[in-house]
Curated annotation (Swiss-Prot):
This is Hydroxyacylglutathione hydrolase, mitochondrial. Substrate binds at K186, F187, F188, H216, E217, Y218, R292, K293, E294, K295. Zn(2+) 1 binds at H97, H99, H153, D177. Its EC number is 3.1.2.6. Its cofactor is Zn(2+). GO terms for molecular function: hydroxyacylglutathione hydrolase activity; metal ion binding. GO terms for cellular component: mitochondrial matrix; mitochondrion. One of its GO terms (biological process) is glutathione metabolic process. It catalyses: an S-(2-hydroxyacyl)glutathione + H2O = a 2-hydroxy carboxylate + glutathione + H(+); (R)-S-lactoylglutathione + H2O = (R)-lactate + glutathione + H(+).
Length: 303
């Protein structure tokens, strides 16, 4: 795998709107220049398309058939432009959840590109044509897509796990606002028990090499909180220094891998002694509840 900077796009500041502002923590990239990136494998390509202030859309391309899917296309024109640039056939929309900053472009995109199948796990998803639930499967070209039901951030949240039969390349998972690099989404419509199941029992059981493509660029702030939870974790400090360098270059910190998340993400590490001690409990689910509540009120330090 390698990354190639493709284009520079300015953050769309002020477009997010009141609804999406409610759902997002303080953005790190309000006025920064952010680059899209292309992750290339022999079986699939994934183009990271920055959107709004800190969102990511993902153009998933099957290399065998040149069929494509778009994940959370909140800025439809950027999607249309990327599809034309790659010369692929866009047939599918993968919606992780109904919040405006993820599903808010669906209606416009289906007008710009008629005939799209729009997948999602919630009737609140705009332009929905195919409602899915846990372990539903379908194809994007020759790629296999498995739906993973991960309720908590919203009650209908779906992550999409993508593999290619007989491929030696790493799988991909598009996690929306369930799993971030070094973090997880707020529990707007769920409980600590549900997030524990989503992170540990569902996403955490994917192959460790699985590449994690999340919904937002929150990595630096997440790692600063992780450092607060585990001040002696050198992996966190190293990852934070790396993320700051990426930020300074306007580059994404995505993807991570499932294996990596278990080394620096406090919400994936709720069974670790250091995290349990920080939370003052021996119960991982109570630790999940405690550190999520703590992070909701966490004042991010400058350094």
């Amino acid at each position: 795998m390698w990354f190639r900077s493709l284009a520079v796009s300015a953050c769309t500041v002020g477009v997010l709107g009141a609804l999406s502002q409610k759902f997002a923590p303080t953005a790190l990239f309000h006025s920064a220049i952010r680059k899209s990136s292309l992750v290339e494998q022999s079986d699939m390509k994934v183009e990271l398309l920055p959107a709004l202030t800190d969102n990511y859309m993902y153009l998933l391309i099957d290399e065998e058939t040149k069929e494509a899917a778009i994940v959370d296309p909140v800025e439809p024109q950027k999607v249309v432009d990327a599809v034309k640039k790659h010369g692929v056939k866009l047939k599918t929309v993968l919606t992780t959840h109904h919040h405006w900053d993820h599903a808010g472009g669906n209606e416009k995109l289906v007008k710009l590109m008629p005939g799209l199948t729009v997948y999602g796990g919630d009737d609140r998803v705009g332009a929905l044509t195919q409602k899915v639930t846990h372990y539903n499967t379908f194809k994007v070209g020759s790629l296999n897509v498995k739906c993973l039901f991960t309720p908590c951030h919203t009650s209908g949240h779906i992550c999409y796990f993508v593999t290619k039969e007989n491929s030696t390349e790493a799988p991909a998972v598009f996690t929306g606002d369930t799993l971030f690099v070094a973090g997880c989404g707020k529990f707007f419509e769920g409980t600590a028990d549900e997030m524990y199941k989503a992170l540990i029992e569902v996403l955490g059981r994917l192959p460790p090499e699985t590449r994690v493509y999340c919904g937002h660029e929150y990595t630096i702030n997440n790692l600063k909180f992780a450092r607060h939870v585990e001040p002696n974790n050198e992996v966190i400090r190293t990852k934070l220094a790396w993320a700051k360098e990426k930020y300074d270059n306007g580059e994404p910190t995505i993807p991570s891998t499932v294996a990596e998340e278990f080394t620096f993400n406090p919400f994936m590490r709720v069974r670790e002694k250091s995290v349990l001690e920080h939370a003052g409990t021996s119960d991982p689910i109570e630790a999940m509840r405690s550190i999520r509540k703590e992070k909701d009120g966490f004042r991010v330090p400058k350094n």
